[in-house]
Amino acid sequence: MNKRFLPALAAICMSSRLVFASAASPATVVEKSPWGDVTVELPAIPAQQFPIDAYSNDVNAAMAACAAAGGGHVVVPKGTWLSEGPVKFRSNCALELADGAVLEFSDDPKDYLPVVHTTWEGSECMNYSPLVYAYGCTNVAIVGSGELRPRLKTWKAWQKRPPAHQAMTAELYHWMSTNAPVAARDVTQREGNFRPHLIQFNRSNRILLRGFRINGSPFWTTHLYLSRNVLMEGVDSYAHGHNNDGVDVEMTQDVIVRDCRFDQGDDGVVLKSGRNQDGWRLATPTRNVVVRDCELVDGHGLLVVGSEMSGGVENVYMHHCKATGKNVYRMMYLKTNERRGGFMRRIAMEDCTAKNVRLAAFEIATDVLYQWAKLPTYEVRLTEIDDIVMRNCTIESAQRRDKISGDPRRPVGRVTLENVRVVSSRP
């Protein structure tokens, strides 16, 4: 199917260019952490432009021409445009959303076929394509001050997770637990209703996300998966549906998230590394992540690790962030269960604030299974939890300062709560 962009309003926009370093010597961004510098290599992308209105409003045609010419910027001009299908990245290309540009996405599931190699809550599968999808790409970016805006009617209906979805979830769990080939794990069959991600960078390197706005998401909003060298800055993310995390960093290394605003229906910044057998098979920890100067306007957790973290999560540092909403459940939350294995270690939050926290400001839970609790345990592997720090944080109100529910078979290791102050308690 030819995926085209249908302009409701259009005007050619000559926005300022963002010129990247050369491929021979990529520019870098460095942030400090307690465990050493985190260095991110930036993408090297030529400045030449490929406006989509020069390619019959077809962003993928513009992307193909851009890649064939050695790379550049695929520009979505000012106006409202409809994508009837996914944007599929090529290496050395940037998607530039010009000032005043709104890129809408259809909500017809057939537009996101054929299936692609993706994930569902930590399990690899073949599913509808993410709306913006990069697989195996190098030097890619989404930049500009425009907006990504998916239509959500179908995806909202799918949030109800009917019996057919629950049955397919159980089947995917069995496939994963028995190491079935990923190519055979097609979850689009029998009305499984597995919603696609909005943005997924899968097995990619040198990724820049800068300055644009997100307005809604079918599922996880921005998913960084099995990738390296990611800078996400100045992104304004709004999505208030089910499972609408702000950014999920999964089995991804060398990541900086800064100066972003998250207004979410689920967690804000989430660190993951695969579910059970898939996490063990891929064996790629999420590592070397710095998050600073971000705001969680609304959402369940400011910094959350898990529960899908079987490949391990380590060397994570959040500082000078704030949770300003009234419906934040926790500031820092580490969650796992007896099926996960893996590790959570060297994770720190410093100099952060929150207005209202509905539950505990800091929590560790080792028995989190959600809807998967009714499914069988194929193998017990306990999680190492050690060197966890929360320091110099102030919460205006919370039910309690901290709650730690460890597993006596593998007790929680070192936890430091230093100068963590709850001004007033709430029921």
Regions found by a protein language model. Give the residues of each.
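Short glycine/acidic-rich loop motifs that flank beta-strands on beta-rich extracellular proteins
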Residues: 71, 83-86, 106-108, 151-155, ...
